[in-house]
């Protein structure tokens, strides 16, 4: 009878595929991959100079640097502006006090002297103009008479000349005497009249006689204000051309500072790599020894199980061991039992042996590990493919949204911040100086109104009397000039009393504009890279699962080779020798031919037909 079950040597050929060895192999593969990944990551992370090429850090460092420098520049500029304003205030106060005390006396003295000289000069000018008018009038009358006389004489001369020409036949110019008379009168007129240059000199003297006195006050103010003007001019020049960044340190260069530490990281990477390789080597040796131990353990378990089965067969008195083991193999293997017993499909003994070899307890572990791995890979691939497809759709939608956005976040921030600075400046000036400006405007209005009413009152009282001019002069010198200076001071204060908060500088704007912020599509792109990494790990799982299935399929080759060897051995033994076949029950004819075996009737009271250990004698047969 052909043996369809696996004997002990055939079982031991599969002990290297036990579940413990498979798990240890998977752990070993995991360890090897982890070691490779750690070494690669150490090289790529610790020794990768691209870490120092992070374009997101340098703009931040530049922005912080420019914010500090800009704050110092603002402080320096504010100091210069405050000094300029202080000098202007001191200058105006000094000029105001000069005007308050010294300007009054100069104004009154100027008015008094100017009034006296103008009276004298006006009188002289009146006399000269009267004399000239009289002389001109007289000379004009004389000139008219002379013109009449000249006409008569010219007529007589013309007549005489005509008579003379009748006798002499010559001609003469009739206007020669007339020209002589006219010229003589013109010279006489110019000699008698007072020259006009005298009046011009009087006017110039009147206008310039008090020039030095009027310049005395202006010179005093100029002497006082000149140092202030020079200082203010220098400060304005400094403010417009001063290089605030002189001496300021350069921004931190992230790449240079990062590369300085790369040599230290290289030493760290070398030490870590040696540590990983050393520990991995010992773990690898331990796992290999554990696999060898699992093979020995499973071999012992299979040998013990086979020995117990032999003991069971011998103790129960089973004389048909091959037949018993064949039946036991069919019932013990779930696949063969399902095909033969449940489905009723007849299989020959060699097919049953091959199925037993392919789906033994050891071999089917490899098969199920491989199948479950492939199923897991398919499920993970479906999940990752769905997630990646959805993520790509989201990336496209974000790209469309970002393209439709006209301004970046930094541009919006700069615009809003400048608007906030302007609003804060207006609000601060409004809260701090609005009351003062209202008071200054009110005082200016009051001063203007007071001066208008004062002039109207003086005009009503003195009108066009001779006292109107001196009174107006005295009032202007004592009151009007002071009020005008106060009015100018209030106007200057109203124009300059404000706080100017500087806007964000161009350097800070450039730094913020170069900063890259977190974008949804960039995050999704990174997640997409992670999915690609998972895809690679899934492919590795697929390779491992296919490798397990390949090992299981390799059992077909081993089983076929084993069957071939068994067939070759059985053929060779059949041709060379004969062997006693397995015992089986005799048929009725065989019992008659060989004699029916009987058991001894006195042994255990067994039925006489159930034992072949006692044969009857001839005498018993004859009976």
Swiss-Prot record:
Protein's GO biological process: plasma membrane fusion involved in cytogamy
Membrane side Extracellular: residue ranges: 1-19, 114-281, 387-537
Induction: By pheromones during mating.
Keywords carried by this UniProt record: Cell membrane, Conjugation, Glycoprotein, Membrane, Transmembrane, Transmembrane helix
Membrane topology, Cytoplasmic segments: 41-92, 303-365, 559-623
Compartments (UniProt record): Cell membrane
TM ranges: 20-40, 93-113, 282-302, 366-386, 538-558
Topology with respect to the bilayer: Multi-pass membrane protein
Main location: membrane
Gene Ontology cellular component annotations, sorted alphabetically: mating projection tip; plasma membrane
Nuclease found in the keyword field: no
Residues carrying sugar: 132, 182, 207, 218, 243, 403, 444, 455
Family: Belongs to the PRM1 family.
Chain's role: Involved in cell fusion during mating by stabilizing the plasma membrane fusion event.
Name of the protein described by the UniProt record: Plasma membrane fusion protein PRM1
Gene assigned in the entry: PRM1
